């Protein structure tokens, strides 16, 4: 592990040691006293609702050896006591201090750093790339989707004996990725796509493209891997002459182009031609977006000279975070749990996948698209048109804005009697229980904040099912859907159901 000496960085962070020894190493870091471990450094962040300085004593009790604070709330006696086991450092701004120390930490590592951004699929792309890189390197990667001004420095501060870093970068406004890339200093970057996420803040997809391209500002050379199927990235690729671009795609001819694509119920298959050789690939999750994720990971792996056979295995084996096109079969019904995030660009492929399934009704449960501001009506109406275009059998919407989806689906030819619009998850779950049958396919698609897990969980809440036949009775704990399946199989001409 490459360590940072507190004394050496004090001038850079404008730090004043209030107590304790300045000659200490900054190793593990924490911003939460509930999870801090002995020997770590505590950054007492100040937020809207709380000030981490209030928990500094707790951090020291749990073994913190350094605490950064931006307001001295301690008496001389308290500082004297704290200084026996920890060093308390006063800085102008704790968050800025974390950023500056992360920059120092990054400078100590001459390793591959792959940065990923995009409107849709950043986290799943990051997971596949990290899995591919792990075939050759000891990889540190962004945990979850901790991709902001706190998450990026914390990921970098987690570097120990790693020899590669895969880091995700998100943004809500222009200028944010510019700062993140200056912290991480990528050696290679990936842009998964340019869509409409956060368009309410940025005003247009073209402005979103500019904000995502800020990722180049932290690179010595502009080597970037881009999705050539995305209209704005494709256009930029043709116009830009300043950067080295590596392209991937399914529809547009690219350096890495997927061919013979087969989207199956439980994953994808495709062929990739490299130097006149054909290689077969599979992914665990279905849909174009996971093929594009795989292609970006293949491009990264080949850039770092990872053997193609190892890349094949890694792509097939890569685990993707929960609630992103999770396929589950229960009681002979197929559920597509895709409710981590939602945008026009992520909803379209989910609907296309649902449309391609056969047998039973194809039911789409869709919620409000968040963070789109004045573009809300337009984007929800475009989703409604996609629902009708994909011949979805039943549509259930949840939320005020999602009503634009339902109304537009009807305007585009979907039967009105097959569209149900609600404001709560309970209403949606109740209707779903009522209409669902054996063999149906159900897509649950929404942003995480819509809590669509409540709809899914509501289908499998346990009930008591009593069965009486010939004077003999039995009682069973079953889910609502299992109970319904049993009742549907009973011959109603022979038996009475109560």
List each model region and its residues.
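Short, basic phosphate-binding NTP loop
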Residues: 2-115, 124-131, 135, 150, ...
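Non-catalytic positions within long, well-ordered alpha-helices that form the structural scaffold/packing
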Residues: 56-61, 182, 355, 388
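Glycine- and acidic-residue-enriched helix-capping/strand-helix junction motifs
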Residues: 473-490
């Amino acid at each position: 592990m490459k360590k940072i000496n507190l004394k050496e960085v004090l001038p850079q962070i404008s730090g004043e040691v209030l107590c304790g020894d300045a000659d200490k190493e900054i190793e593990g870091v924490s911003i939460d006293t509930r999870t801090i471990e002995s020997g770590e450094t505590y950054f007492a962040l100040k937020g809207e609702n709380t000030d981490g300085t209030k928990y500094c004593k707790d951090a020291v009790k749990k073994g913190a050896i350094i605490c950064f604070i931006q307001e001295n709330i301690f008496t001389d006696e308290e500082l004297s006591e704290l200084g026996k086991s920890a060093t308390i450092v006063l800085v102008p701004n704790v968050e800025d201090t974390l950023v500056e120390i992360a920059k120092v930490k990054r400078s100590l590592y001459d390793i591959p750093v792959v940065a990923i951004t995009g409107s849709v699929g950043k986290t799943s792309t990051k997971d596949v790339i990290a899995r591919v890189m792990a075939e050759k390197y000891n990889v540190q990667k962004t945990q979850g989707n901790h991709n902001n001004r706190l998450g990026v420095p914390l990921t970098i501060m987690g570097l120990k004996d790693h020899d590669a870093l895969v880091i995700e970068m998100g943004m809500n406004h222009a200028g944010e990725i510019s700062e993140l890339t200056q912290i991480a200093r990528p050696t290679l970057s990936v842009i998964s796509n340019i869509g409409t996420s956060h368009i309410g803040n940025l005003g247009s997809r073209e402005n979103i493209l500019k904000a995502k391209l800020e990722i180049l500002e932290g690179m010595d050379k502009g080597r970037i891997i881009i999705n050539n199927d995305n209209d704005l990235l494709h256009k930029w690729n043709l116009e830009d002459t300043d950067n080295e671009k590596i392209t991937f795609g399914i529809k547009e001819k690219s350096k890495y182009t997927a061919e013979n694509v087969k989207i199956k119920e439980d994953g994808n298959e495709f062929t990739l031609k490299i130097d006149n050789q054909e290689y077969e690939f599979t992914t665990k999750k279905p849909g174009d977006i996971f093929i594009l994720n795989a292609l970006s990971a293949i491009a990264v792996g080949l850039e770092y000279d990872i053997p193609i056979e190892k890349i094949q295995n890694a792509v097939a084996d890569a685990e993707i975070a929960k609630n992103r096109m999770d396929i589950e079969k229960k009681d002979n019904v197929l559920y597509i749990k895709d409710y981590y995030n939602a945008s026009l660009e992520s909803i379209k492929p989910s609907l296309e996948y649902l449309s391609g399934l056969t047998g039973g009704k194809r039911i789409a449960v869709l919620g409000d698209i968040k963070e789109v501001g004045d573009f809300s009506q337009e984007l929800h109406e475009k989703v409604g048109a996609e629902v009708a275009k994909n011949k979805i059998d039943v549509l259930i919407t949840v939320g005020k804005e999602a009503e634009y989806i339902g109304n537009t689906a009807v305007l585009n030819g979907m039967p009105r009697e097959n569209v149900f619009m609600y404001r709560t998850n309970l209403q949606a779950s109740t209707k779903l229980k009522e209409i669902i049958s054996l063999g149906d396919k159900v897509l649950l698609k929404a942003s995480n904040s819509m809590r669509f897990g409540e709809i899914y969980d509501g289908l499998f809440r346990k009930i008591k099912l009593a069965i009486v036949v010939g004077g003999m009775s039995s009682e069973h704990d079953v889910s609502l859907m299992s109970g319904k399946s049993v009742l549907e199989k009973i011959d109603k001409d022979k038996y009475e159901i109560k």
